[in-house]
Amino acid sequence: MEKSFVKRVFAFFLILAAFAFLSLPQAFAEPKGTVVMFHAGSLTMPFEAMEKEFEARYPGVDLQREASGSQAAARKVTDLNKPCDIMASADFKVIDKLLIPKHADWNIRFATNELVLCYTDKSKFAKEVNAKNWYNILQRKGVVWGHSDPNLDPCGYRALMVLQLAEKYYKKPGLYEKILANRPVENIRPKSVELVSLLQTGNMDYAWEYRSVAVQHNLKYVSLPDKINLGNYKEDPYYSQAVVKVTGKKPGEYMEMKGASTTYGITLIKNAPNQEAAVAFLEYMLNPKGGLKILKDQGQPPFIPCRVPTQKMKSTLPEKLQKLVEVKD
């Protein structure tokens, strides 16, 4: 009889344990489903590598990415109302100006970069161009050079900022307009990475790109002084002299983008269809041993730890992300 009683007690606790296990919160379950991300074109190669690594860890998740200029990515959310979980911008200010507060609550700064002038062995004056004469070569007849659309892609307005700053740095009045006079409108492309194929096929001699893009595509490039390359935060007061007007939130509206060091931002869209899996990806991406390592390996310096400007913003982050972020303006 005692044995029978023990068996019944054991069975009772076994059933209780089963119920407890089945009633565990969903947080303990692996994320699954589709995660949609709109991101800057310059992040295509590192995000491709992250996608493979993340999906290997979480086979139930399908990360679907759309690359474009950063403003274009934001407008897919604001104007086209396309379903989206995560938006990553080559300029964190695009998130601040176009997505917060209506479409996003916070903005994590995760990496930096700098502008370089890219070329190949096929480029005219490839053996001659350097950091001291590049602005003269871009004015030469027959030289084909371009940049991305400032209204769609931060690399586009940053390229114009570099030219404005070069005029001041080299003390050459009128240099900005003279260089632009040798760049036809058709050499302005929707996103900076589209210029890479034009360089590689010999259809363009020079193009403004981020250093990380140049490294990832094995392009030759001219490195510029810190005073004009938008790559050193200590030079932000000098960079702020450059201002470019671009299209704003609504048709007919414009906003001024002021020169500053190149800083990338990422956010979770408020009505994210798959918030759980999106946060899992962000937790992986912002980890120094995860996505940030891939960025570093591909020539783009990450912030370790990543940053938000205020404690108030940090407190709005999902709990899993707060440990990966510091408060630093």
Swiss-Prot record:
Signal sequence residues: 1-29
Q: Which UniProt keywords apply?
A: Signal
Lineage, top-rank taxon, reads Bacteria
Task: Note the coiled coil stretches, chain numbering.
Answer: none
**UniProt KW Ribosomal protein keyword:** no
Q: Give the protein family.
A: Belongs to the bacterial solute-binding protein 1 family. WtpA subfamily.
The protein, known as: Uncharacterized solute-binding protein SYNAS_25580
Q: Give the organism, scientific name.
A: Syntrophus aciditrophicus (strain SB)
